[in-house]
Amino acid sequence: MAQQPDTEPGMAELRAARRDHHGLLWSVGLFSVFVNLLQLTGPLYMLQIYDRVLASRSEETLVALSLLTACLFLAMAVLDHARARVLARIGAAIQGRLDARVFSAALHRRLLHPSDPTTATAQRDLESVQRLYASPLLTALFDMLWTPVFAAAIFLFHPALGWLAVAGGAVLIAATLLNQRLTQAPQNRAITLGQQADQVSDQIRAESETVLALGMTGAAFARWQALRATALADSLTAADLAGTFGSAIKTFRLFLQSAMLGLGAWLVLQGQISGGVMVAASILMGRALAPVELAMSQWATALRAQEGMQRLALLLSRHPPPPPRLTLPHPKAVVEVQNLTVTAPESAQAVLRMISFTLHPGQALGVIGPSGAGKSSLARALIGVWPPAAGKVRLDGATLDQYDPDALGSYIGYLPQRVALFDGTIAENIARLALCPDSAKVVQAAQRAAAHDMILRLPDGYDTRVSALGGRLSGGQIQRIGLARALYGDPVLLVLDEPNSNLDN
């Protein structure tokens, strides 16, 4: 039997993020106490109308009760709005705390394990948790805690009315649990297949030039459509089940209120309760069962959040937070490679074995070999994105993992075999996505890459906006901008993977 992955470390991180807001959750609970106590306003108002106002025919009493009731309902609305706002901000705060952690974990995990599905949906999974807090579901769960209290209040009116409310509530809760059990599997399958279809669609759009040029549109659509159709079928199955249960629960709740009125009317005829009690019991039962119906309508949100939390816990467990590192001094660029062995991600076979060399400042090393010989693998090991399977890569005596990753990145210039630009201006791309690029450093890097004059000829120069696919730029122009990005900040170690590809002469 396959061993289940350990998600406890990641789940502990998620619980810690939520634990920071326990005080606010307690305040939501306190608001819920007053909101649900104020839910008794309607039944008590009806009791007073039937048993006091109509009996005394006092207009003054009616006006006073109506004004008091309006004030109480206004207070309930304010408190209900306040707790919804607090819950929404708790969700936003949890997302804000975990955003950087999840982003970094997904980035590093995807580098070493490209096929891991948790990396493709990490940010959306975190958003699903945030949406759970912003949805009406959590307020409904707080209100469901008061369902037994309302049922007990109905018992005070008359035991027969109380037992009817308890029996009806039990049926609704059982239907809700059965709905959750039956819809969870198709809903999960629909989510998984939908994510796979989205990945295929993104890949097809990214390679649209090749797809159109080689007449692959039909085949590409068929691959996407196969996944999409299966996901849609499972989604419809889950929606049909949820719709059936939702309609049944809504209809049954309306029937229960009518049954409560019918039973109450019979008890009135027997002289055991008053007309006010009959109406108040019906209203109170509606208040007691409304959270169950609301939770039922929002159950899909809960399922998405639950699945998202499981995937996030798995991702965070597989990529724990890095330990704190001592800030090392700026290196002088002495590179030592000692018996280096490199394996590709998700592979146990070594691409390079027992490589050793030393480079001092000012020295260069060219690596020549056929395709698949491991040149790019060596480059990735030298910049630290592929950890060595054996041996060491040292920069000024320290292994690369002893440096802070962001600090190490500023010391290194890297031009990959396939250069990619990011959405933004050319200056921002050269400045490695800095929000406020250093103009002098940007121009200096472009001049060193022989890209300055080419950039000035573009419509907006360094402020020309480009897309992730390059847009109007040729392969050679993208290559030169990538080289300028590698040279930005005067790095101490420059690693270039086929730097002259796409360049004329």
What are these regions (language model features)?
Residues 32, 65-72, 139-189, 262-273, ...:
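Transmembrane helices of ABC transporter permease
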